[in-house]
Curated annotation (Swiss-Prot):
It is found in: Cell membrane. This is Uncharacterized 39.9 kDa protein in amylase 3'region. Keywords: Cell membrane, Membrane, Transmembrane, Transmembrane helix, Transport. The keyword Transmembrane applies. One of its GO terms (cellular component) is plasma membrane. It comes from the Bacteria. It is a multi-pass membrane protein. The keyword Transmembrane helix applies.
Amino acid sequence: MDPIALDERIGTLDYLRGFALLGIILVNILGLLTVKTPALHSVDAVYQRFLYFFVEARFYPIFSFLFGVGFYLFIARANTRGENGAILFLRRILVLFIFGFIHFLFQPGEALTVYASCGLLMLPFYKIKKEVNLFTGCILLLFVSIFAAKIFMPLPLILLGLSAGQYRIFEKLARYKTETAIFTFFMFILSVGGLLLQYCYVPEQPFNNLNGLEKNYQNMDQLKWFLHLGVATGPILSAFYAGFLLLLLQAPIARRLLSPLKSYGRMALTNYISQTALILLAGKLFHLFNRITYLQSLWLCLAIYVIQLIFSAMWLKYCKFGPLEWVWRMMTYNRKFPILLKKEAD
């Protein structure tokens, strides 16, 4: 295997991770603070529709796909260094599961334990041909999407991420701008079609979907189809979002303007868990549980964006890794790593 070129590819992945995190919090906050059901014809009702059209089930697929890419890169790099990549990866996902279990105590809808479990299931696929992984991932994703089986969605997405790593897609993006643009346009067309289909079932009244569907909700079948189609079309919109961002990143000015997103993504584990911490802290300090509205949840998320984006950029000016990324790395390799960046000599 050729040596893996890291810099540009990993930078691209960090932008995508950061972007995915921006969307994930908008949905997670709803359950964490038990957001109030919007009033009919209110701004909150409009924002709820926006979330279920453009955010819900549209961002975690990106994160799942990137986990698969990272899975491949981690083992490939370890093997290139002469280490046992499979054993190191097992230790890595064990530590991730521990992080996830602790996080689960505060956020029952957390994803780290799911990724760790899926990583264990996906390990044998590392040695399978990339063509087989791509075909299997597409078939599984189609099957899961048709049935809107959200709980199983990460599996095919991680497998597709693994195959993308095997194809070394993120090393070739600069050479395939036209292909990326065609893919993104195709995903845009499919996204428009999916959204129009979902719009046909948009519920007239706001709803509460935080702890299961309301039993006395009018037009229950319509609501179920609306939510079903939202999950089913999620990977398509995710692919469009990711493709559009990748096209933007081809421009140097876009990379500079979006550089805070890169730092945000480099500290994805720290920021994902601290999102929960900041939401729960705000809920406790400002008595937001069961009282906050949909629109107010957006303002709180924007405040958390500012805090985390600034913190990530400042932290990485002086440190090599995010706080939890550093702990994760040391527990994976069972040795200490310096966290501070070396100061350049005058």
